[in-house]
């Protein structure tokens, strides 16, 4: 086989349908758009969620909730992820970022209690769950809220 003998797989290449090119083509005159009406016009068509003039569902339902502008989003770290550090290490948010445990600092770091911790660490974070704090101290480590 040579480069000039290469051919596409059968059925993988289709010829484009040229609409509006004479009635003999089967797609002439109205070009598959039917007669008149909104969908026959250029740029015609209804917007997403349009229900033919009936009040759409998104307007029938009441508004609900709000966005708290003071919301804090914490970078979450579970206990089992802290086992990558050596015994006696002081774990800080900067160190977590450097080691790739978290990708972004966000509003701070929160330590959660999923998994086991086998190392004795001093963990500095912005928040701790009760179970995480308990587990770190049970392993002989310390927790410090910054």
Swiss-Prot record:
Classification via Pfam families: Ribosomal_L27A (PF00828)
BP terms from Gene Ontology: translation
GO molecular function term, any single one: structural constituent of ribosome
InterPro entries: Ribosomal_uL15, Ribosomal_uL15/eL18, Ribosomal_uL15/eL18_sf, Ribosomal_uL15_bac-type, Ribosomal_uL15_CS
Region (Disordered): 1-46
Source organism superkingdom: Bacteria
Record keywords, A-Z: Ribonucleoprotein, Ribosomal protein, RNA-binding, rRNA-binding
Gene Ontology cellular component annotations, sorted alphabetically: cytosolic large ribosomal subunit
Biased segments, Gly residues type: 21-31
Family of the protein in this entry: Belongs to the universal ribosomal protein uL15 family.
Role according to the record: Binds to the 23S rRNA.
HAMAP family: Ribosomal_uL15
Subunit annotation: Part of the 50S ribosomal subunit.
Xref: NCBIfam families: rplO_bact
UniProt-recorded name of the protein: Large ribosomal subunit protein uL15
Native source organism of the sequence: Geobacillus thermodenitrificans (strain NG80-2)
């Amino acid at each position: 086989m040579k480069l000039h003998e290469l051919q596409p797989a059968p059925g993988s290449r289709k010829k484009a349908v040229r609409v509006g090119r004479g009635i003999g083509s089967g797609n002439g005159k109205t070009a598959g758009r039917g007669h008149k009406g909104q969908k026959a016009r250029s740029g015609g068509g209804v917007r997403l969620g349009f229900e033919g003039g009936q009040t759409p569902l998104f307007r029938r339902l009441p508004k609900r909730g709000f966005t708290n502008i003071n919301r804090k989003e914490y970078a979450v770290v579970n206990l089992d992820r802290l086992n990558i550090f050596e015994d006696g290490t002081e774990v800080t948010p900067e160190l977590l970022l450097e080691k790739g445990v978290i990708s972004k600092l966000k509003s701070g770091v929160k330590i959660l209690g999923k998994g086991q911790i086998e190392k004795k660490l001093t963990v500095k974070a912005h928040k701790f769950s009760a179970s995480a704090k308990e587990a770190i101290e049970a392993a002989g480590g310390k927790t410090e809220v910054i």
